[in-house]
Amino acid sequence: MTKTASKWGRKAWVVLSLCVDLGLLGYFKYFNFLREIMAAVAHELGYQLGNTSLQNITYQPLDIFLPVGISFFTFQTISYVIDVYRGRIAPLRRWIDYVFYVSFFPQLVAGPIVRARDFIPQIYKTPVVTRAEFGEGLFLVLCGLFKKTVISDYISLNFVDRIFDAPLLYTGVENLLGVYGYALQIYCDFSGYSDMAIGIALLLGFRFNVNFDSPYQSATITEFWRRWHISLSSWLKDYLYISLGGNRKGKIRTYINLLITMLLGGLWHGASVSFILWGALHGVAL
């Protein structure tokens, strides 16, 4: 890409790379979801039009293997391509360095999303772990493990799941407590994984940015997204929201850009209508 003299040539390489990355993500993670949506639409059209052939369309999911961490390393590869295109980092000299950046294991399961310009410079430095960093890394791993296994899993198995599975068996207050319990469960689960990833990386001589900053202390939705899953929200802002025009093209366009960003952010979390609605609600709130 950098060897191409033409500006349009470089853009073409970027577009091709994005199509490959997003195409693979779309196939592995969203193909069955799209087929299910299309089957439901066809069935409804058949019912409305009285077409029995459309009504008889059934959805059978394909057995597609979902690569571990595909949502995270796809965003990492996209950040590398765009940062090189924008001139924020120099292209890697060796392919093995790129493979190392994409496949570095601590964050692949649940983040944080590691950006090329933050991680790649660390590759060329000799990893040195001081006593303080070793203690900090070990503390983060243990805290993350405690959040995940002791708090999140316990709340899920012994409280939240029971209420969500049979809400009519419980009072309104108990259902409300179940909602708050789920909020605590999802925070401890997600931030626990992030803490462990950051701690393991630190023990190996690499530093990741903080991914959660007491999000439930936020006073507004905007502040919440500055504190919750920081690596994702900042990635969406820098590589999607700003690329769409951000707030530079008027109030209506700003609202549209926010809604698109949050819709895609919700879809990134999972292939289901509930995640799309969740993203839409946050987009409207922002």
Where are these regions (language model features)?
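Membrane-embedded transmembrane alpha-helical bundles that form the catalytic cores
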Residues: 1-286
